[in-house]
Amino acid sequence: MSLFMFNRSVSATVKYFTASSPPAQRVREFGGTHAFINEQGREILFNDGYRKAANFYKMFASQLDAGVLWIDRGLKSACHHYDPDTGSGMWFWPNAAEKCSDFFSKAQNLWQSKKHARSIFFLGAATHLVQDLCVPHHAACRLFGGHVNYESWAEKRKLDYKMDRGGIYDISGHPEDWIVDNARLAKEHLCLVDNNSTEDYHRATKALLPRAQFTTAGFLLLFYKRI
């Protein structure tokens, strides 16, 4: 395939997947915490010496962010939880570890089928889950209990926790293990996000938002090495 045709394929696919998203929601999500973490993941890859991988994901940045947006819409958000103590998710829904593995495998298969933009779209969905499990409420399967308040607080202050090097690359060759590992750390910080304390929010976020950026870099490199 020529470079021109490849770029046209990428553009057409991402337009298809984002066309049905409400404009306000699309602006909010693409400018939000997940897109910020994706961007920092690319920067971490670059600064850690994985420049080819970083440039690859820069080329596919919009597709990755489109997948991040899509998985937060509708009932798909019910699968964003994983309790590391029980190995379960929210109620009868598949847990985040299962869904992450499914999306990662789908992304690999699509890439091998030359459906590149669609592949990175589903990788974005998998990466979103890795990031979500750095939030204590997702690791405790809690929809309430200050969940929205904490995420809103962290969203407004995300630039204070910006990382640009030192990615985590050695968790596992299995996508689901990245969910489990992040969930273990996040749940340890649950007590800090229960009481709306700014000081406690800071203590939790200082550990967890950098973790989301570091593991995003590692998770993206895992996929890059597979293709």
What residue ranges belong to the model's regions?
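N-terminal, motif-rich segments that launch catalysis or mediate targeting to/interaction with membranes
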Residues: 1-113, 121, 139-226
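Active-site alpha-helical segments that house and flank conserved acidic catalytic motifs
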Residues: 118-140
